[in-house]
Amino acid sequence: MDTRKNLKELIKSSSNIVFFGGAGVSTESNIPDFRSEEGLYKTKSNFSYSPEVMLSHSFFKEHTEDFFDFYKEKMIYKYAKPNLAHHALAKLEKVGKLKAIITQNIDGLHQLAGSKNVIELHGGVGRNYCMDCNKFFDLNYILNNKEVVPKCDVCGGIVKPDVVLYEEPLNMDNINNAVRYVENSDVLIVGGTSLVVYPAANLIHYYKGNKLVLINKSSTPYDRKAQIVINDSIGSILGGIVEELGY
């Protein structure tokens, strides 16, 4: 069975596609994922705590300077550019085929590629808010701030990135929005995620159709439920297909 050809036909024939993606979408933009052998959780660093600990709400509260040291070094990739997957998805949205992108990533590369309807389950590095007065700050304010801990230029409060840390709940509006898109989609393409991070991985259970596509370099717990499984680079697969279709 030519899975790539089948995916091409699905994309060609559908105008109600939803994409759900994880860290593997951005690894081709040289942003490391979390759980692979080269991922953030496996590689050695100069920090005294594990990434899981440092990316927790309690660590942010108790060791705010250490949090920002880690965050600025390991979570922000200001020179990263959208890759073939990001551009392909933006084109599919532009021609009216893709209705929403649901992402676990915080890098903002989908928007940089031109995608409009992006649901960021774990937040985004481009949004930062004063914890006291709620003033908005962009990423440059964090990067260019001379202090390790960025402070609000109005009230002096700590400026916290709008990313979901461990021990923090996901935004229920985003979850409900994502569920609605998944439930109503004709084709659900899941890419670059091992589907082991909950509650985000639960989204797949809301899909009611019979055109589930999984594109990931390694197998996932949901492979047997999918109509199409492709263990390959999501950028080369989606990028190639979208180019062939002339979108």
From Swiss-Prot:
Pfam families: SIR2 (PF02146). Nicotinamide binds at F34, I106, D107. SUPFAM superfamilies: DHS-like NAD/FAD-binding domain. The active site is at H122 (proton acceptor). GO terms for cellular component: cytoplasm. It is an enzyme of class 2 (transferase). Its EC number is 2.3.1.286. It is found in: Cytoplasm. Zn(2+) binds at C130, C133, C152, C155. Keywords: Cytoplasm, Metal-binding, NAD, Transferase, Zinc. InterPro entries: DHS-like_NAD/FAD-binding_dom (IPR029035), NAD-dep_sirtuin_deacylases (IPR050134), Sirtuin (IPR003000), Sirtuin_cat_small_dom_sf (IPR026591), Sirtuin_class_U (IPR028628), Ssirtuin_cat_dom (IPR026590). Signal peptide: none annotated. NCBIfam families: PRK00481.1-1, PRK00481.1-3. NAD-dependent protein deacetylase which modulates the activities of several enzymes which are inactive in their acetylated form. This is NAD-dependent protein deacetylase. It comes from Clostridium tetani (strain Massachusetts / E88). The gene is cobB.
